[in-house]
A protein has these predicted regions:
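Surface-exposed acidic loop/strand-edge motifs in secreted or periplasmic proteins
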Residues: 28-107
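Intrinsically disordered, low-complexity Pro/Gly/Ser/Thr-rich segments with frequent PxxP/GP/PP motifs
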Residues: 48-72, 129-164
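Asparagine-centered strand-capping/turn motif at beta-strand->loop junctions
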Residues: 110-118
């Protein structure tokens, strides 16, 4: 009987460990962006990954993510989406949203919080609805222990953040 309870307990712990892991996959959803008081852009977004190849983050308007990363030679590697901040010294908080006024698009805003003791440098590509393609854009580095807001007047359906590094 003792062996049975031990086996049940070990099985429970193993199942809990497997299913309690932070998920890198976003479920499919409907992306809706306001254009003006009468028009909206809508698209079905399929199930996809937040972090691609351990170094690229893709986020959509309305998403807020917690990203942990390891540091190797001033480069951020092994990016991982986590469900909450359990390691504040290595977890970036990143949010992307649309700002509207009276149902009319005003601008898109990216918020990024740098938990590191050095400046955070990164690159951004934005997918502009106007052109239907990815465009590289300039962003400011985020000071150590601070946060930044980036804003664009264009309608952006998604952004890619990559080339994360720490600089003096």
């Amino acid at each position: 009987m003792k062996k049975f309870f031990t086996l049940v307990f070990i099985s429970f712990c193993l199942i809990n460990h497997i299913f309690a892991q932070d998920s890198n996959e976003r479920e499919s959803f409907d992306l809706v962006l306001a254009v003006d008081e009468e028009q909206y852009f809508s698209a079905k977004i399929d199930k996809s990954q937040y972090v691609i190849m351990d170094k690229i983050l893709q986020i959509f308007p309305g998403e807020k993510v917690y990203i942990e990363a390891d540091v190797l030679n001033y480069n951020l590697i092994n990016l991982k989406k986590v469900d909450s901040v359990t390691n504040p010294e290595k977890t970036m908080i990143i949010e992307f949203k649309q700002v509207c006024e009276e149902k009319t698009h005003k601008y898109m805003m990216l918020y990024i919080e740098n938990p590191y003791t050095k400046k955070l440098h990164y690159s951004v590509n934005i997918c502009l609805l106007k052109y239907g393609k990815w465009i590289s854009t300039d962003v400011y580095d985020v000071e150590a222990g601070k946060s930044n807001y980036e804003m664009w007047p264009d309608l952006i359906s998604s952004i890619l953040l990559d080339s994360f590094s720490l600089i003096d």
